[in-house]
């Protein structure tokens, strides 16, 4: 269903450098497509302002003609619908046709069906991987053509680089994947602010200091406070792509996938935002970002039950556990597959954003509050948040109990600690914005924060 959102956005923005092929063979894994849908795909895309070309998808000349036509289209993307035959040329064991059969969708041909199919396609079953002379000649000719095309491209690039050294250096830096330089010292947070508002202040600085950053919101920029970024730039429109903000509309999965695409392309830093409870709609994309090690920044606000008048449909309960599970899973390189950060107050929010921008190897989750949060006690060393968990200033020596939390619950622990201290109980409060980061520290550090055998709540 991602095609719905992507199709709408591409048509709305008039992306005429986009050509999409649709293999329309009327067959799916379990049934023919007419068993589950009667929609007119061509009319649907035309309604989204796409140019639609329908061809015989098994005809190479028709494909080339359609591509040539599509390249000439301006002001809108193009969909090429190729009406094809599923399993074209395939034969069953009894040598009857295997075309337009659901069984060929995901199963390999074997036995006599395999032999009969190779024969039917003009091949030799005893030498099935033979390369026909005409195919070999075609590819050799194309290889030489491509060498010339590539050489011309490199020559043009070298000429442009020589004429535009500053832009060339900037382009190289952006595509290097290195973390951008940001003057974090200019960010002044307001004590007691909601962490979503603190995030807005950071985003305002990033909008002016990180030229290749693009932020998106699923119709919630005023609430998730990505408007802090938007106010320093403007949203993309069909006729103006000079801004750095994508208004995705109510389409969380589409928005997330767009950011994954930007990250895969390279050269830009992509971030997207919505309410934390709606991260459920984005899970497939989040999972893919973790698998592909894409440094997309996921901004999720309204992180607890204090979300206002919307009620339980907007109150995230299980979402944090789900996202933090991904932080514990290792990727193919053996690293945490995701960095999850839930800051305790406005100042810790700045540190969280710094960690997010410096994380260039995995996706980052930034989880912020809707409600205002009291700052942690004076003298708190927020730089320690980079270790995932640390002892909050004002904690007692030799504590009777250690209270651990992240986000807005840390200030709740502070209030509770005052009551416990009146009863003579010594309290250590630990802010743990990232369990994954904390568990990546040395055993000595972990034990210094939460000693083995200590009484721990949280």
Where are these regions (language model features)?
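Thiamine diphosphate
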Residues: 3-130, 136-367, 372-374, 442, 447-449, ...
């Amino acid at each position: 269903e991602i095609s719905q959102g992507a199709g709408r956005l591409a048509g709305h923005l008039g992306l005429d450098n986009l050509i999409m092929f649709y293999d329309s063979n009327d067959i799916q894994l379990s049934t023919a497509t007419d068993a589950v849908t009667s929609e007119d795909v061509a009319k649907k895309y035309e309604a989204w302002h796409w140019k639609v070309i329908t061809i015989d998808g098994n005809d190479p000349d028709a494909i080339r003609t359609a591509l040539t036509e599509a390249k000439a289209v301006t002001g809108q993307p193009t969909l090429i619908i190729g009406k094809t035959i599923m399993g074209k040329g395939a034969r069953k064991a009894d040598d009857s046709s295997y075309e337009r059969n659901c069984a060929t969708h995901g199963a390999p041909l074997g036995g006599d069906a395999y032999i009969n199919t190779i024969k039917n396609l003009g091949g030799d079953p005893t030498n099935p991987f033979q390369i026909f002379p005409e195919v070999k000649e075609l590819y050799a000719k194309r290889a030489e053509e491509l060498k010339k095309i590539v050489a011309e491209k490199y020559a043009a690039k070298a000429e442009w680089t020589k004429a535009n050294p500053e832009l060339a250096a900037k382009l190289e830096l952006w595509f290097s994947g290195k973390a951008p330089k940001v003057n974090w010292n200019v960010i002044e947070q307001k004590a007691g602010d909601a962490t979503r508002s603190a995030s807005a202040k950071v985003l305002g600085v990033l909008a002016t200091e990180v030229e290749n950053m693009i932020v998106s919101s699923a119709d919630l920029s005023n609430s998730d406070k990505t408007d802090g970024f938007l106010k320093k730039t403007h949203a993309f429109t069909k006729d103006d792509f000079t801004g750095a903000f994508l208004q995705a509309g109510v389409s969380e999965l589409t928005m997330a996938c767009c950011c994954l695409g930007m990250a895969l392309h390279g050269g830009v830093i992509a971030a997207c935002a919505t309410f934390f409870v709606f991260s459920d709609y984005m899970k497939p994309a989040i999972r893919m970002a973790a698998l592909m090690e894409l440094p997309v920044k996921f901004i999720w606000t309204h992180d607890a039950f204090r979300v206002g008048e919307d009620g339980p449909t907007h109150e995230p309960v299980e979402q944090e556990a789900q996202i933090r599970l991904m932080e514990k899973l290792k990727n193919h390189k053996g690293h945490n597959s995701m960095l999850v950060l839930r800051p305790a107050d406005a100042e810790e929010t700045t540190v969280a954003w710094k960690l997010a921008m410096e994380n260039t190897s995995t996706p980052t989750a930034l989880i912020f509050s809707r409600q205002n949060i009291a700052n942690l006690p004076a003298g708190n060393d927020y730089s320690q948040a980079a270790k995932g968990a640390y002892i909050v200033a004002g904690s007692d020596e030799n504590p009777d109990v250690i209270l651990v939390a992240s986000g807005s619950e840390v200030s709740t622990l502070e209030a509770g600690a005052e009551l416990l201290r009146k009863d003579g109980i010594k309290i250590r409060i630990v802010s743990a914005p990232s369990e994954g980061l904390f568990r990546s520290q040395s055993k000595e550090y972990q034990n210094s924060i939460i000693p083995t055998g200590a009484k721990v709540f949280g």
